[in-house]
Structure formats: structure tokens, C-alpha cells
Amino acid sequence: MKINSSNNTATPRITIKSLAATLGVSHTTVSNAWNNPEKLSPELREHILRYASEIGFQGPDKLARALRTGNANTIGVIFNDSMSYVFIDPHDIALMRGIASRCEAQDVNLALIPLRKPQQTGTAPLTALVDGYILNATHNSADVIQQILARGQRVVTLDFQFPGYSSVSIDNAGAMHDIAHYLLGKGHRRFGIIAFASQANVLGMRSLREPITGDNTLMLTRVNACRDAFLANNVNVERCWLYETRHDEEHGETAAQALLTAHPDITALICLSDRFAVGAIRYCHRAGLAVPEQVAVTGFDNLAVEVNGVGLTTIAQNAECKGEIAVELLLSIGPVTHHELPRQLVIRESA
């Protein structure tokens, strides 16, 4: 389609300055109609807004205002996986529901910032215009995280702690001790653990002979808590195995197959999430391994109650409440606070 440029007359751009000139008031008065309404009489503000609406002016440029004042009225949520992950993972769906509900109540916007971007190569600068960040169990050495810390912006961490910043978490080590001691009490001595990666791109199987290291504090806390419980009960950790993988049911199934094929003496699979546990039970069902008679399986989060007709033994936590408190801490001016939420070992048929 060809546009006739002779008829393409540009409409003059409406600004606060031009609006003020038309109304015969100051630039500041017009600005206050949107940004500081308490400084104007209701009648004057209504007069300005009504005229602005009549001529199609929606108000000051929010981006320009954010750049000028340093206040974007937006918080960023950073997580390890791709953007679509938070709309698929049950834990993160509940977490984001809590975050979003508090943002709505405070009239604050949200920006979702994934650390894993499939098309990205090299180091990308952090360009999001936000007032502060919620870090959702992130890899701490990621370039984006280091940029945030270097800028000194407001931060609240979820399921791990940074010195000088507020956090929200359950006692993850205590939760894993609960699971480990429960399984030990059932007589298990050969364990496999299915976990998300200890650091970016570290995947596969390894022994628990040595403490696990990396930069995903949540994963390290949970796995090493299990290892500590095993050692305290004279379990041979050289015959206990860890499988690190991508976080979903399919990879949980693959991990269970790899662990039980390579080490058929394993009698209990400890999964760091219910999603992993779903996959593990699916594999056991497919391989003809009775759960829990031949292989016990535990999860984490209490979001998958039953798999293949088997109730899942797991740790219950309130992810939605975690998100709500994170926003409250981020928007508050109070001192650094570490908020610990309750957790519960929920015993069902799988272990």
C-alpha cells in the first residue's frame, strides 16, 4: 500500500508544556494533576484532566518520569529458567500469584527477568527499569545478579540469603533432614537424589562422596543437608548418588531411569521438587518397580498430591505466602529481615 505523503500532515505533539500554555497555568500545575494531586484543588485538577482527555492527552511520559526521578514504580523478579517457566511450574505459579496480588494492592508493576534465554550468547547488560528485585533461588554468580549487587539496588532473596538483604524462605536444611530421617527410619541406606543444577550447565550423575559445591544456594542447602543426615547415621555416601538435571517431569523421569539403571541397589529417590517426583514415579511404573515397596519416592512443595494412583510423600510450603511477603519486604523501608515460613512433612503412600 502506497501512502500519499502530501496528505500525511503530522499532528503537533501534546506535552505538559503545551497543555499548560493552552490552559494558562504553569508547567508544574499541570504535572501535579497526575503526579501530586494533593497539591491542587479538586476543581482545578478536574479541569486539567477533563481538557487533557478531550484532546487525547494521556498524561506525562512515564518512562521519562522514571528516568528523571529514579522511581519506575516497578519491581523485577529474576529466576533461573526461561520466561515460559513461571507459567508452567506449579511452585512458581503460586509464587507469582502471591507477588502479583501484593503488587496489585500497592499499584506496582512487575517485570519478569529470566536468567536463561535460549537465543542469548555472551553477557547481556541488565536494562530493566525497576526499583528493586526479587531473586527467586537464583544462581548467585550470574552476571545479572552481580550487576544488581554492584548497583546497590533494593533486593529481597527467596530461599537463600545475601548479607545485607532481606529474605524469605522455609528452613530448607531442616526440611531435608525431615525427609532423610523419615527414610532412614524406614530402613533405607542406598539413596538417589534428583536435583536441579548446582550451577549453570552442570548436569549429570555423581557420587555424594564429597560435599556438593556451586552457586545455587537452594540446591546446595537441600542436597548437602541430606548428605549430612546420611553421614550422621553411618550411611556410606560413596554409594549414594546425585543426578542434576533440568527442572521438569520429563527430566525427573530420565534421571530416575539413569540412577536406577546404573545403581539398582538404590531403594529411595529423594526429589528436590514434586515435578521431579512425578517423573520418578512414572519411570518406576513404566519399569515395573513397585512404589514404595521396591523404590520409595519423595517430593518437595506439596503441589502434586497423587501420581499414578500413588499419594506423594513430600514437604509442604506456602509459595504464595512467600511471594506476598517478598513484595512487602521489598517495598518497606524497615531493617533487613529474614522471614522464615513454616514447612511440614506430609506422609503419603510413595514412601
Predicted regions and their residues:
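Periplasmic-binding protein-like
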Residues: 130-136, 192-194, 242, 263-273, ...
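Short acidic capping loops at alpha-helix termini that bridge into adjacent secondary structure
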Residues: 189-190, 237-240, 291-296
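Flexible loop/turn connectors
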Residues: 253-351
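Short beta-strand-centered segments that line the small-molecule binding cleft or hinge
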Residues: 120-174
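Append "Primarily bacterial transcriptional regulators
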Residues: 19-20, 48, 295, 345
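N-terminal helix-turn-helix/winged-helix DNA-binding helices
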Residues: 2-14, 53-87, 106
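Hinge/beta->alpha junction and helix N-cap segments in small-molecule ligand-binding domains
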Residues: 81-94, 113-118, 168-178, 193-231, ...
